[in-house]
Design a protein with these regions (language model features):
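Elongated, mostly alpha-helical coiled-coil "stalk/stator" tethers of large membrane protein machines
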Residues: 1-178
Length: 178
């Protein structure tokens, strides 16, 4: 995420917080990012210098007609400044600020097989106790980890996978003097 994305996304969050619209604008911002990412040609059109900015902004007005005026104005501002490519970073910055204000920690759990419901509940309870935060868990299945669990959260990786243990063992064996 660039500094520009942090600044713009953070500013939108501050405005939303002042107006008590953080949840609504977060959902609409996600929808906007997903829509624009799903249609890369649309982003190219909105970024084309040969199309006057006024017309590009009119396209945004039409595409996001039902969205909150703050979001539409935000998108138009990015368009006018030729910064629509920063929109995913703006969403990340907004989400980060939202998470801090709402004591939320996003965690990605990677395992060889899907977690069972009881294991998921135990993991959530342990993470909540360990961090004191509300956990939003994203699960990913990757057979390459062979077994165990890898957790990525807030820039920290806790790796208890069989794959990692084998890598560590391989490194120790390679470093051993024979």
């Amino acid at each position: 995420m660039t500094e520009l994305a942090k600044r713009y996304g953070g500013s939108l969050y501050e405005l939303a917080a002042e107006e008590n619209l953080t949840v609504e604008l977060l959902q609409q911002l996600r929808t906007a990012v997903n829509s624009i990412e799903a249609e890369p040609q649309y982003l190219r059109l909105l970024s084309t210098p040969s199309v006057p900015k006024k017309e590009r902004c009119a396209l945004l007005d039409k595409a996001f007609e039902g969205a909150h005026p703050y979001l539409v104005s935000f998108l138009k501002l990015l368009c006018e400044e030729d910064l629509l490519g920063e929109l995913p970073g703006c969403l990340r910055a907004y989400q980060d600020r939202y998470n801090v204000d709402h004591n939320i920690l996003e965690v990605t759990a990677v395992s060889a097989i899907a977690l069972t419901a009881p294991n998921r509940e135990k993991l959530l309870a342990k993470l909540q106790k360990m961090t004191g935060k509300n956990i939003v868990l994203t699960e990913t299945v990757d057979p390459a980890v062979l077994g165990g669990l890898r957790l990525d959260m807030d820039g920290t990786r806790l790796d208890g996978t069989v794959q990692r243990h084998l890598e560590r063992l391989r490194t120790e064996i390679d470093g051993a003097v024979l």
